[in-house]
């Protein structure tokens, strides 16, 4: 399932991924403390996530359950970025991504292991 999340929707999902299933009121309290959102803003964003199929609403008390994983969103967002900026070329993406950063020996070793697993 590929769902495009806006930044505000991503914030709600991050709370659910980090904390697990919660009542909407609990999400509102967390986001009030973390980023200053009021209750109405949080409920509006939760409802948008429900409409997109990212969250399931369960009763009683507006219980929210994430229907998509962080990994699914990361994959979809990464694919969109690669398609948009690199013409779909993962090689160009990795080349650009790795050219500016100094990688540690451990990071280089982990990348080599990942590539070897693909063979």
Predicted regions span which residues?
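Alpha-helical DNA-recognition elements
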Residues: 44, 48
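Short helix-coil-helix linker/hinge
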Residues: 5-8, 21, 87
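Amphipathic alpha-helical dimerization/coiled-coil segments
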Residues: 79-119
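A short, conserved structural fragment
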Residues: 50-59
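Pre-recognition alpha-helix immediately N-terminal to the DNA-recognition helix
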Residues: 10-15
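Short helix-coil junctions and helix-kink-helix linkers
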Residues: 29-37
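Short, cationic-aromatic polyanion-contact patches
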Residues: 3-8, 60-79
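Short acidic, hydrophobic short linear motifs in intrinsically disordered regions
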Residues: 22-30
């Amino acid at each position: 399932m590929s769902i495009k999340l806006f930044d505000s929707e991503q914030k709600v999902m991050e709370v659910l991924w980090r904390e697990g299933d919660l009542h909407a009121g609990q999400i509102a309290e967390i986001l009030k403390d973390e980023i200053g959102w009021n209750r109405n803003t949080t409920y509006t964003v939760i409802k948008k996530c429900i409409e997109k199929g990212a969250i399931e609403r369960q009763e009683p008390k507006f219980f929210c359950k994430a229907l998509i994983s962080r990994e699914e969103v990361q994959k979809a967002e990464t694919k969109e970025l690669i398609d948009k900026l690199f013409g779909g070329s993962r090689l160009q993406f990795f080349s650009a991504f790795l050219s500016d950063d100094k990688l540690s020996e451990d990071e280089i070793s982990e990348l080599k292991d990942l590539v070897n697993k693909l063979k």
